[in-house]
């Protein structure tokens, strides 16, 4: 009768059955270790890049939402007053916190009292106010680059421009030009 290769082998010493041998041979063990090592070398860089990919995706989502909100606010300004300067234009809802000042080009500039006939985006606080009004639930923002304080850092760039750096990975940013309404997303972590 033939025994299967998978069945237990029995050693005989001088005709006596002494022990049953089970397990891996040394060669099998070495092969498994080598295969696991190769998999680790190939897979490790991909798994390490997952965190960066998540940060890039977060900035892309925030940037796309911000860009859409700028476009909608501009459309509302065009419909309400022909796109010129407007003070306290109700963007959505009916609360004072949902109002924005629109500049002479018809784009969001700030949210500050008192009345201004020609509102301008001209400091980091204006950048923060535009950000906070345009998002219904905005990612946290401040003028600090401390990741424990806020997700984004607002930086004013003269004239009338903002750069929102992503604090967990500062190479990523969202750029807003209030004179043209352009929103640019820098989602290259190597830039």
Residue ranges and their predicted role:
Residues 1-24:
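N-terminal leader/signal peptides at the extreme start of proteins
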Residues 1-7, 45, 58, 63, ...:
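A signal for specific C-terminal beta-sheet/loop modules enriched in small/flexible residues
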Residues 6-9, 41, 96, 155:
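Intrinsic disorder/low-complexity segments
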Residues 7, 20-21, 44, 89, ...:
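Hydrophobic transmembrane signal anchors and adjacent membrane-proximal interface regions, especially
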Residues 18-54, 58:
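N-terminal single-pass transmembrane signal-anchor helix
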Residues 54-83:
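Membrane-proximal N-terminal amphipathic helix
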Residues 78-191:
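Periplasmic/extracellular, small/polar-rich flexible segments of pilin-like filament-forming proteins
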